[in-house]
Amino acid sequence: MKWTVLLLEYFLVKVLVLLYSADGEAQQLEGFIMLSGSNGSRDEESVSEPPHTEDKCRGYYDVMGQWDPPFVCQTGNYLYCCGTCGFRFCCAYKNSRLDQSTCKNYDTPVWLTGQTPYKKTLDPRHDPTKDKTNLIVYIICGVVAIMALVGIFTKLGLEKAHRPHRESMSRAVASVMQGARQGQHEEAIGMHTQHYDTVQARANNMQAGQINNMMQTHPYPALSQLSHVYEQQQSAKDLNKYASLKAVAAKANGDFLNKQHRHLVELAAKGNLPLHPIRMEHVEPTATYVTEVPCIKQNGQKPKSIKANVSHPAMAYSSNTIANPGMLRSWEAAETAGRRKTYNPRKMCMVEQVNELHTARSHHYLPTQPYFVTNSKAEVTV
């Protein structure tokens, strides 16, 4: 029973509270309507506010202690000062507007005003005029430069001192070698001159014999006279050919000696010539001398040809016909004084016998056509 009474009381209290709250809201609403009805013109004036055109950001000290001057936000839609107290900027949103009255960084910070400028304290014992550190560096560089110059000049002096000795040695060696080459060259020229004199004497003897034979008169031209004329022409050709070959050989020898001389001079100039003497051998080209000489027998047999191979040590010499038997001999080789002169025995026919046979025939028979023997394979009779 007791609990029932308590529940009823609680229920009644709730109902009364609800009623009281409903009456209070009705009274507030009636009072608001009355106020709005009595002050309508003032509310209309407060609603029609002018549009926001600009906002000014005040000057402040940023977090680095630097002063940022004030600026105005009036560009386009960026009409509000936004950001933080240490970093401010213009924006277009009103709800992001910064309340600048709450910031405290409009005055100089305490940590910035408390610093004092650093002053360099000079040591009274230190005298900058007596500081010799730079002087030591200059002294070291100067000593190094002087040592380098001394080394360079010493090297140049040593080279200059040894140069005259080297030049004198090279000149002496070159002169000795040049004298040896000149002696060899003169010896070779003497050999060629001796050969040329021998050939010239033989040619003169041959021409004298031909003139004596031509002085004889015959009723008809003898075969011996025609053969002598042909042989004279051949001997002149042989002499010309020999002279040309001699000139070519002398030129070749001179070029060879000049090349050797130039090479030795270069070696002497370089200073690397050997100290021991060098033996230079003069090698001359060799060639064979081939000819055929007809040999006519008394009994009327066919003539036989004798081939003689003669090696000439100085130059090559060849011809088709020999004028006299003396030219069949080998050229005398006079390279050294101790060499022996060798001759190969050959069977030869005397041209005088041939001339006598042709002279005897010319008195009894009519002159025949001259027949000349050459080395060519196809012999022609004129």
From Swiss-Prot:
It is a single-pass type I membrane protein. This is Protein shisa-9A. Glycans are attached at residue 39. Component of some AMPA receptors (ionotropic glutamate receptors) complex. It comes from Danio rerio. The keyword Transmembrane helix applies. Residues 154-382 are cytoplasmic. One of its GO terms (cellular component) is ionotropic glutamate receptor complex.
